[in-house]
Amino acid sequence: MALLQISEPGLSAAPHQRRLAAGIDLGTTNSLVATVRSGQAETLPDHEGRHLLPSVVHYQQQGHTVGYAARDNAAQDTTNTISSVKRMMGRSLADIQARYPHLPYRFKASVNGLPMIDTAAGLLNPVRVSADILKALAARASESLSGELDGVVITVPAYFDDAQRQGTKDAARLAGLHVLRLLNEPTAAAIAYGLDSGKEGVIAVYDLGGGTFDISILRLSRGVFEVLATGGDSALGGDDFDHLLADYIREQAGIADRSDNRVQRELLDAAIAAKIALSDADTVRVNVAGWQGEITREQFNDLISALVKRTLLACRRALKDAGVDPQDVLEVVMVGGSTRVPLVRERVGEFFGRTPLTAIDPDKVVAIGAAIQADILVGNKPDSEMLLLDVIPLSLGLETMGGLVEKVIPRNTTIPVARAQDFTTFKDGQTAMSIHVMQGERELVQDCRSLARFALRGIPPLPAGGAHIRVTFQVDADGLLSVTAMEKSTGVEASIQVKPSYGLTDGEIASMIKDSMSFAEQDVKARMLAEQKVEAARVLESLTGALTADAALLSAAERQCIDDAAAHLSAVAQGDDVDAIEQAIKNVDKQTQEFAARRMDQSVRRALKGHSVDEV
């Protein structure tokens, strides 16, 4: 019996008719395409039997090449040969230049600050470059399957934010592909291993690719895949190993000039070749730019040790989020070509206390999982009992009075998901409300990330708290967020789809979760203070309105007592003593109780005036 079966409109396969679907691993260094044939998932090779496609595009005035042919031109035509474009996806030009100062490309900024790469083929953005890689993969699949693809599942790092995910979908559309779903890379690996081995329990997926690192803690049970927690670093991968080794070789060779792009490429190529060789050998000879020398595995390990340690710190945070200890993990799945590095396997094994799984080629496992998922989503497996539950990496919420963040969807909530929460107006006669969408784990707006702002207008002018606005957050299966605000009595509404202009910085990604734990006690105190200050402001504003309307109900002595209490509250509300503010609010409440009762009596008498008892 199927646990969950959702068919895309128009994609229900007719009996005995298989639809053509593919899984695409759009990687930083290499990309792959896979499909399911005769019940088996397999990656598709090119004419020369090569399964990997280098994620490199070489642009010329009359066209472009993708893959190995493009990579071969890198040393001779560096500025027109674009590689590792995935690292630029969803980032601003300023962010890219600060993060990767040695990139050899000619950048120009568009109107909104996004990067444009000046090539022989004209100005191109990262979405266009990614689209050209996707086109090459789709063409390989169509030729191998003898038909056009009906749909694809494309994998992305678990830490990709809205802008990076949207950029990936835009690239697919530009390539003419129908995206069935974006799938987190570690989750795709879990699908591949979960179906093959049938393991049940907690599994860690350690994914170290060319440009990104992801760690996911999953629970597999009776065909249900649930992501308990995710973590990682969107700017850490095997490319960083390569650059560290290239810099070391440069120092050993005495090459001081960094402006020669051809030499830069030779150094990088030599570093990559040495890294690969050191996975099997203890020593490798290097010949570059007229220099010859030896690099040992021990030297390489010393260079990358700090980076490997960073990945293990992320593993520890993810385990804490999932509420499990390293010894609770049954299996550790290794994903990504960089997990072939012996030091990585050794340190990961020591951390989890078990030998990592490498049965499926770590370069291919993500594409294989994506192909299995695509085969299901396209309608070829209507009786599949696999249910996939992804999670959002950071909490989503709204700014409320006092600069506070009210979380609507907590982090690690499974997606797709929709959550609604009701809010009220703060002032009498308020006819509009500013909606400020936030992302993060801290209690104050200043410590979280702003995602979007929009306004709801047309709220009926009622007393403070009289209008009720329902705000709905909806996160789709690809992790993209839309927010809708609706005034319940009139039905007036406004909405926005959150598409940030560029992605989170490394500092934001790495520190937001860590800071939420480090500053937990401080944040709670700050929130309590802010809440009391907001309540004080509300009480004083309400009291001012009441006194303006009905001061005649008070004697001079009563009015003086209320004014004194209000003045004291106004004074202490400027300070940081939560208890003092709370006591001052209670004092105002005590001094105004009789006044409130008289106002209520007066309102009742006015309402009953001219009516008989029978009418009441």
Curated annotation (Swiss-Prot):
Coiled-coil segments on the chain, per record = none
Q: Mention any Pfam family matching this sequence.
A: HSP70
Q: Which domain of life is it from?
A: Bacteria
Q: Does the keyword Protein transport apply?
A: no
An example GO biological process term is: iron-sulfur cluster assembly
Q: What keywords were assigned to this record?
A: ATP-binding, Chaperone, Nucleotide-binding
**Molecular function in Gene Ontology:** ATP binding; ATP hydrolysis activity; ATP-dependent protein folding chaperone; unfolded protein binding
PROSITE patterns registered for this protein in UniProt? HSP70_1 (PS00297), HSP70_2 (PS00329), HSP70_3 (PS01036)
Please tell me whether the keyword ATP-binding is annotated for this protein.
yes
Give the UniProt family note. Answer: Belongs to the heat shock protein 70 family.
> By its UniProt entry, which PANTHER family does this protein fall under?
HEAT SHOCK PROTEIN 70KDA
Tell me the HAMAP family matching this sequence: HscA
- What is the annotated role of this protein in its UniProt record? Chaperone involved in the maturation of iron-sulfur cluster-containing proteins. Has a low intrinsic ATPase activity which is markedly stimulated by HscB. Involved in the maturation of IscU.
This one is known as Chaperone protein HscA
Its lineage reads:
Bacteria, Pseudomonadati, Pseudomonadota, Gammaproteobacteria, Enterobacterales
